Amino acid sequence: LSDWSSDVCSSDLLMCDMRFAARSAKFAETYVKMGLIPGAGGAYYLPRIVGVAKALELFWSSESIDATEALRIGLVNRVFDDDKLAEETQAFASKLARGAPLAMKLVKRILYRGLETDLRGALDLVASNMPVVRMSEDHQEAIAAFREKREPKFSGK
């Protein structure tokens, strides 16, 4: 994200699994200042990302925050110099692309579903998915690659 990200744009931002920002980026939730309430999922996502108290502060005050503060409160995952944002984001995406797709998909599913349950339910989610990944071609490839001291080539199976 670069330049200003506010209101409608930030609702889209909040729906992302990971958020990177340029150092010059600023963020604001100006609904209340406009006599409105947050729509498009903002009131759902923001407190889950930054906590209820910080979400209320951002909504009620309508104050803008810079990228450094957004990083500090967990609104964004990483901040890069403006001229490096695209390059660094691409480098991170390339790093993720080398991961095991099935395991990545299941980690995401377990994390998000885990937010809706208690510890026992979260552990059950892990237990029910562990055989899937342990029997996967990707896991076998990871073991072979480790033994052969090479990078794995995952298939997503």
Task: Locate the predicted segments by residue.
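Short acidic-aromatic low-complexity motifs
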Residues: 61-65, 137-141, 149
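Single conserved hydrophobic/aromatic residue that forms the stacking wall/gate
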Residues: 1-12
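Short aromatic/basic micro-patch
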Residues: 4, 64, 79
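Conserved catalytic cores of soluble enzyme domains
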Residues: 14, 24-75, 90-96
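Terminal low-complexity tails and localization/encapsulation signals of metabolic enzymes
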Residues: 144-157
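Hydrophobic alpha-helical segments typical of transmembrane helices
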Residues: 42-45, 54, 66, 106, ...
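C-terminal long alpha-helix characteristic of the crotonase
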Residues: 20-25, 67, 76-124, 128-131, ...
